[in-house]
Every structure is written in C-alpha cells, then in structure tokens.
C-alpha cells in the first residue's frame, strides 16, 4: 500500500517537474528572443550562443536526472524547432513567438535599420523599374549547394562570361541592323535637309576670269555640294538682314550717273573716310545679268593697286543690286573744261596722256583690255589722272566675250568685229579723248565727224605743236598695226619735257 502511494506521489512530482521544465524553457526562449529583438533595435546584434548561457535550474540530483530522462520524449517531438531556438539562429522576432500563431503578414526578408542615428536622407529610395534594352536574357541556373566552394565560384564566373558574350552578340545584332538601315537610306536626302544645308553653306566662290594663274583660286571647296541645292542659293546677300549700304555708309550726294549705274559720295561710319559707292540702277534677277555686272569687280580685283587706276575696296549684292565701293576722286576729265575758262595747255595734255598710258601699259601687261577709254571714265584726284569704269573690260586672248564701249571712241575694226588687236583699241580711244580735250567740246553724233575720226583724218589744231598733232594721228591710225603700243607711247620723246 505504501509502495503504491509512493509511486503515485512520484508520478505526480514527475508530472509537475515536467511542467516546470517546459515553463522554464518557454520563459528562457522568450527572454532570449526579446533580448535579441532589443539588440536588433539598437544596432548591437551579436551572435549569442545559448549553449553557453548558464541555467538557473541546474541540478545534479538523481531526481533531476529522472525528470530529464522523462522529458527526452517531448524534446524528440519538438525536433529541430527547439534545437534551433536553443542555438539562437533567429535574428529577429516574429508575432507567432508571442501568440503561438502562424504569421501570414510579416515578410520573411525584413530590412531592419541597423542604428539609431541613421538619417532619412541616406536611406535607399525606391526606384521605378528600368526597361531592359537587351533582346534576350538567360536565367541563372541554381547550382547545388552540395558542391565545394571552388565549383560554385567557377560556375558563377562561367555565368558572367556567358552573360557578357550574350550582351556582345546582342550589341552586334543591333549594330548590324542599324548599319543595314543606314545603307538602305544612303541615297536618300530629304528636301528639309537640303534646304538646311544650303542655308548653312557659305556663298559660292566665283571664278575670276581675269586672273592668269588660278591654280589655287579656282577651287570651290563646296562646289560638289552646291549642285544639289542650286535653287536654294540666295541671289543676293545682305548680312544679317539689314542694309549694308545704310548701315556702313552715310550717303552725302550723287556725283555721277550712267545708263546702268549711279555713283554716290559717301562717308564710311567705321573709319570716317570718304568713298564713292557705285550701284546698279535696276535689279539684277537673272544669273547672267549678275555675272555681267560682276565683270567690273573681277577686273578691278585682278588688276590690284596702281597709282593711275581708281582704287577698288569692296563689293556686295543687296536688294538684287550690285554695290561697289571705290576710291573717291575729285572729278572726271570731262568736267575739266567746265571748271576753267582757259583751254588746257599742251603740258597738261602731255601729263594726262603719260599717266593714262602708264595705266594702259599696266592693264595690258595683265592681259586685259579696257575697251571704254573716254573722258567720262578718266578721273582726277589731287592732280593725278586715274583710269576707271572697267565694265567693258575683256581678255586680250579673246577668251571672254567682247563688249564695245562708246561707239564715238571706238575704231573701225571693232565695228567690223575684228578683235585681233584689242590693246590697240585702247590706244585709239586715248587719242580720240586727247583730241576732244584739245578741242574743248565733246564729240557730236555727226556722221561726217565720226567717219573722219575713224579714218584718222584730223583737222589742224591751232596752238599746239605739229609733233603732238602727228602723235595723235599715229594713235588714231586706221590700221591697228601702225598704232603704237602703250609701252612705245611711254617711250616717245615728246614726254621728255615732263619727265624729271
């Protein structure tokens, strides 16, 4: 009886010990979990080994051993869950640790902050997904974790190499497609692109027909591109849209006029000097008209500076008109008799002949013929005669069309279209100019007077030496071969009186 009661008492005590053991384990588990959770909150989480934690209920009695042996069954049922809890492998606390219920809300991978003084400015911000540009991508194979570390390292490198090769192949495919598309559209140029290119293209480089050596100046760097957009080239240029003439010059008064142009005395605003600006009276719409008007500019530019030739400075098209900036002279030779009631002396005539002969010699040496020598085209500045108005200038080799000047000063061969001696035409015109200057009155349109002059039949000129009259007859000879050249005229002994 006592043995039976002792067994019953022992069983009750055993059950109570099991309950106490379970309760103590639960308490220790919760304490460890709370401690780790608090350490996580303060960024001081360290690996805590629960195996080294001292137990508060350690007993060495046999009774405790019985209790431990009886609870082994319960430990086997708990399995790996209890062992994991005892080893402290959890780094965070879940709601089921408190309420023993499954947690379906808390995500498995929580991004917990690791410190109290972390600023919000440094926290990562969510970004919108980036669109992938690759055509295809490979999925990384899941490697087995049973292999050694070297195998996993090699497999990861192999995957990276495969991905890089795949990206290279993709880039090559895209590059080939772009190149193919560009090749297909190589021959096509849109009208908008052509118009834009023409607006950005500089004006054309005109060929100067009066320049002998054009090895460098005849090259137009944009010539091969202008053929595509010739219709888009402007017929005139005016800088930034404003009038260059009104912007750069102050017009003073008109000093000359002709059939095709007018000449104004102007003051240049930039340098404060006086110039003569000549511009066409009518608008030049056609390309042939513009090229014809440009002949004077090109001839003056090809000649360059000479003391007995009117200086050339600049030219431009504006409002379909050609503007030429020239040297300003005092007056023309035709105005000389009007300025003085006295007739021109023979010495003054020799000075005029000598200076214009020097100008003609310089022009002829350049391979150019003036073809419009007359009193209106000879100017005087500070007592120096200057030859101007090269609108009818042409080449001596007949490479350019011949346009005759004033018919009153032209020899008969020009009227007969004989252009073999164009330099002698200028000598004839100079003789007629001097004859008109000695006479003191302009030539008339009288048929008889015109025929006598073209035949070289001059009346006597009282008050002048026979030597001068004979020189004039030689210069106005009907046969151009018997006329002196400009060089021969300069060497004539009559000019010895004015030399030195």
UniProtKB/Swiss-Prot annotation:
Pfam families cross-referenced by the UniProt entry: Pkinase
Enzyme class: transferase
Residues annotated as the enzyme's active site: 372 (proton acceptor)
Keywords: ATP-binding, Cell cycle, Cell division, Kinase, Magnesium, Metal-binding, Mitosis, Nucleotide-binding, Nucleus, Transferase, Tyrosine-protein kinase
Binding residues annotated for Mg(2+), in chain numbering: 377, 389
Bias (Polar residues) ranges: 143-155
Primary localization: nucleus
Induction trigger: By replication blocking agents (hydroxyurea and aphidicolin).
Family: Belongs to the protein kinase superfamily. Ser/Thr protein kinase family. WEE1 subfamily.
Biological function: Cell cycle regulatory kinase that is not rate-limiting for cycle progression under normal growth conditions. Transcriptionally activated upon DNA stress or damage in an ATR- or ATM-dependent manner. Once activated, inhibits plant growth by arresting dividing cells in the G2 phase before proceeding into mitosis. Down-regulates CDKA-1 and CDKD-2 by tyrosine phosphorylation. May target principally CDKA-1.
Record-linked PANTHER family: EUKARYOTIC TRANSLATION INITIATION FACTOR 2-ALPHA KINASE EIF2-ALPHA KINASE -RELATED, WEE1-LIKE PROTEIN KINASE
Descriptive protein name: Wee1-like protein kinase
Organism annotation: Arabidopsis thaliana
Gene behind the chain: WEE1
């Amino acid at each position: 009886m006592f043995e039976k009661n002792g067994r019953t008492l022992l069983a009750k005590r055993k059950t109570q010990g099991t309950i106490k053991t379970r309760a103590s384990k639960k308490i220790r588990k919760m304490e460890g979990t709370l401690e780790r959770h608090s350490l996580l909150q303060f960024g001081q989480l360290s690996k805590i080994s629960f195996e080294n934690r001292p137990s508060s209920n350690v007993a060495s009695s046999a009774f405790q051993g019985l209790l431990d042996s009886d609870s082994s069954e319960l430990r086997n049922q708990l399995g790996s869950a209890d062992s994991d809890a005892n080893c402290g492998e959890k780094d965070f606390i879940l709601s089921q640790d408190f309420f023993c219920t499954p947690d379906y809300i808390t995500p498995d991978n929580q991004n917990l902050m690791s410190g109290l003084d972390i600023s919000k400015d440094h926290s990562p911000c969510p970004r919108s997904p980036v669109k992938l540009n690759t055509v295809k991508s490979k999925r990384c194979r899941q490697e087995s974790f049973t292999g050694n570390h070297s195998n996993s390292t090699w497999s990861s490198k192999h995957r990276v190499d495969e991905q890089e090769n795949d990206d290279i192949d993709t880039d090559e495919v895209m590059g080939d497609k772009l190149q193919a598309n560009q090749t297909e559209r190589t021959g096509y140029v849109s009208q908008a692109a052509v118009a834009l290119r023409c607006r950005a293209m500089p004006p054309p480089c005109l060929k100067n027909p009066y320049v002998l050596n054009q090895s460098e100046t005849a090259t137009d760097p944009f010539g091969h591109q202008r053929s595509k957009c010739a219709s888009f080239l402007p017929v005139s240029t005016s800088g930034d849209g404003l009038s260059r003439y009104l912007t750069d010059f102050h017009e003073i008064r008109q000093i000359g006029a002709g059939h095709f142009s007018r000449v104004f005395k102007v003051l240049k605003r930039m340098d404060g000097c006086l110039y003569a600006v000549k511009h066409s009276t009518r608008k030049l719409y056609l390309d042939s008209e513009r090229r014809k008007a440009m002949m004077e500019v090109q001839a003056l530019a090809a000649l360059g500076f000479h003391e007995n030739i009117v200086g050339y400075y600049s030219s431009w098209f504006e409002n379909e008109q050609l503007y030429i900036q020239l040297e300003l002279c005092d007056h023309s030779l035709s105005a000389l008799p009007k300025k003085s009631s006295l007739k021109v002396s023979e010495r003054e005539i020799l000075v005029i002949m000598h200076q214009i002969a020097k100008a003609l010699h310089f022009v002829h040496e350049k391979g150019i013929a003036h073809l419009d020598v007359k009193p209106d085209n000879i100017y005087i500045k500070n007592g120096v005669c200057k030859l101007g108005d090269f609108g009818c200038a042409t080449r001596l080799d007949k490479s350019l069309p011949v346009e005759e000047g004033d018919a009153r000063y032209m020899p008969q061969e020009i009227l007969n279209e004989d252009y073999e001696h164009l330099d002698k035409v200028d000598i004839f015109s100079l003789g007629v100019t001097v004859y008109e200057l000695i006479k003191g009155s302009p030539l008339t349109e009288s048929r008889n007077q015109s025929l006598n002059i073209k035949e070289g039949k001059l009346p006597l000129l009282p008050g002048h030496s026979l030597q001068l009259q004979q020189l004039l007859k030689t210069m106005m000879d009907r046969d151009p071969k018997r006329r002196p050249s400009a060089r021969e005229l300069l060497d004539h002994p009559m000019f010895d009186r004015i030399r030195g």
